[in-house]
Amino acid sequence: MYRFFENFYDWWKNIDKFILFLILFLFFLGLFFSLVSTSLIASDKLDTNSYYFFLKHLIFIGLGVLILFFLSILKEDILIKISLAFFLITLVFLLMVPFIGIEVKGSKRWLDLGILPRFQPIELLKPYFIVFVSILLCQNKNIFYKYLLSGIVLLPIILLLISQPDLGQTILITMVWLTLIFVSGINLYLFFLFFIFTISTSTYLIFFVSKFEYIKIRLISFFNSSSGNNYQADRASDAISGGGFFGRGIGEGTLNSKVPEAHTDYIISVISEEF
């Protein structure tokens, strides 16, 4: 027992306390909003336990805290090996999506392996992608090869995401890669070229690839509010403005019954209206 407290003291002494408290604060803030803003959605719209989303989030946050603590006590070399192994495993999961993935609302992004809860492989892959690319950028001294190798790692992930289709995650993982190479000290001119290429490719996909036509329609509707296709966005905007500075109060919001995905896509609007 003494050895345990000694190890815990060493861990506490070396941990970045500001980041730890910031993470825990965001965890508990998310739990609070999940409790007060999704109970009516769960009971009225999904006809299930009022605390369904809260308990679901509580379980995953508990697992997240345990994993966070476990990984933080590992030595760096062991952490790197674990990250590389899980990067390959999650990449295999992502490769499985086109073949056995579950299609939801026109996009095939989810896996259901039976023994595990349904999940999106890209959500599991992202943290390991960050570690893997960071290793390539830090350990490879040849400037050309380290950026080339990191780009080669990124390319199959992007192609798999585009095939789902999931442009949002494609842009997100690309921006993560751009951030990593920027922090690594890349030449600003080269970084600017990569950035322009990313913007140009995203624009092409949105306006000229039929898979992403729904995004083009959303953009056109957003900039042309008179088209009448902005019902959900307009309701969300009305909810935010209707809440005012102090909000309507817990459980007094009206957006829950006006949009189909109030507990996910429009949760910020739900919170803004009530608080």
Language model features: what each stretch is:
Residues 84-91, 145-162, 167-207:
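Hydrophobic alpha-helical segments of polytopic membrane proteins
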Residues 104, 108-110, 193-275:
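Hydrophobic, glycine- and aromatic-enriched re-entrant/interface helices and adjoining loop segments
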